[in-house]
Amino acid sequence: MINNLNLENIKVVIFDYDGTLAIHRDKDFVKHRNESVDKRLNYYANAYQKPSNFYIDIEPCDRSEVLYKLVQELRNKNIKMYCLSGMKFSFHFKAKQDFINTQYGDDIELISVGTQELKLDGIKIISELNKCSFDEILYIEDLEDTVKFLKSKGINVINVNEIKWGVC
């Protein structure tokens, strides 16, 4: 049971990808990915060509065990799940979807929103598609700036690091 999450009125849960569903072993992965133009282009080419092993061998990530347990609970409650990822390019879209499918299951739909700033628009669209209010959506994010921004816009958001698993 999740100690500090009230899922009673939640119809949709939306996850961030990097640092939330996918825990990068290299905490400076963005810096290392962009050290040179060649390295950056090679990164995206590898993700496109080898999506099934990209987040295993090239940019290793682990799943969040707390979120894995939460996903199981959400699935049992028939709560719809999405992942909004602020991708510069969509060349690594398949790699991200493959990681999600392998680590969490194939019922989390990945959506690219281009930038962190467009996440609010993504949430609004998901709200419309699912015919639910912001109060019925829970967004889970690791970046505190994004958490604060979304809260200021009326979004029900929690920092992934605040989720506690245990007996209620």
Give the role of each language-model region.
Residues 63-67, 119-122, 143:
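Amphipathic coiled-coil/heptad-repeat helices and related helical stalk/stem segments
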